[in-house]
């Protein structure tokens, strides 16, 4: 007789055993401690080059005494403000603890392990794959073209009647590519009828012409589309974790039902409301980012780097020397950018747009390191 197997309190699901966690960019404190530096510039995580809105800062000070309160369930004030900002029905909007929470909820609500699959490009934002695999789902990827534009034929070929969600990021991360809206319309019409097309527009604010690149204003024509946005980038609230999805109303209702209560805390909600009102700060963010993008692209090109066109608040480039060597040399000078080995691009790097002084320091350091270019 075979003895029954004994489980232990620390046993976990099979998906957890070989799970590879998300790897964030290095922090300023890490590099200060490692190299004994007093001044470190971080251009690795696509954060706001101007920091946090002064209006938001004042709001957080004023509202700090509310920290003992739970936020109102579903964050209706914030939901209405987001809806008004985009000209959509409030019933479509779901706020989350970063848009990552919305990604996770969509996967868990839409997809059944052993039945459904998830599709995205390769490379892509790693959270799509991480959460799909954590949920025990098949994750399929279509390769980008050699120039890092989207191969939609390969993308559509990866889908079938069991594809629960097809994810695309536009502008893309890490390349910065942003396809015309006509391509997105074609994909939305061609995907299997049961597939939800999730368009992650975390960086759309920076593209310069949303009407030419976003389907957000045409959702009524495409019932299979969900759009994700974030407060982390142009609104400068990355540390407060606030994002949202604009979804078909029925799907939005399901997400509200199953989400953890109070995942958007009361101070994040107040900050989001203030950020939406501070149009001056956001406009200045977009201006500084566009100027920095042009400056860094020109500077890197002059140094012999292969620079990809970008519609985002970052640039992907391939240096004329070993990418790891350049990355580490920049670290020693107190400048953090993002190596892309985890994206399968070991010879490429990604640099976020900083303020004017940070951008100059980055290019000056590259000139020191790449004098032969």
Curated annotation (Swiss-Prot):
UniProt pathway: Amino-acid biosynthesis; L-histidine biosynthesis; L-histidine from 5-phospho-alpha-D-ribose 1-diphosphate: step 7/9
EC number: 2.6.1.9
Keyword flag Translocase: no
Keywords: Amino-acid biosynthesis, Aminotransferase, Histidine biosynthesis, Pyridoxal phosphate, Transferase
Keyword Amino-acid biosynthesis attached: yes
InterPro entries the UniProt entry points to: Aminotrans_II_pyridoxalP_BS, Aminotransferase_I/II_large, HisP_aminotrans, HistidinolP_aminotransfase, PyrdxlP-dep_Trfase, PyrdxlP-dep_Trfase_major, PyrdxlP-dep_Trfase_small
EC class of the enzyme, as a word: transferase
Catalytic reaction annotation: L-histidinol phosphate + 2-oxoglutarate = 3-(imidazol-4-yl)-2-oxopropyl phosphate + L-glutamate
Cofactor section: pyridoxal 5'-phosphate
One example GO MF annotation: pyridoxal phosphate binding
GO biological process, one term: L-histidine biosynthetic process
Residue numbers carrying N6-(pyridoxal phosphate)lysine: 233
SUPFAM superfamilies, A to Z: PLP-dependent transferases
PROSITE patterns: AA_TRANSFER_CLASS_2 (PS00599)
Superkingdom per UniProt: Bacteria
HAMAP family reported for this sequence: HisC_aminotrans_2
Family the entry assigns: Belongs to the class-II pyridoxal-phosphate-dependent aminotransferase family. Histidinol-phosphate aminotransferase subfamily.
Subunit organization: Homodimer.
Name of the protein this chain belongs to: Histidinol-phosphate aminotransferase
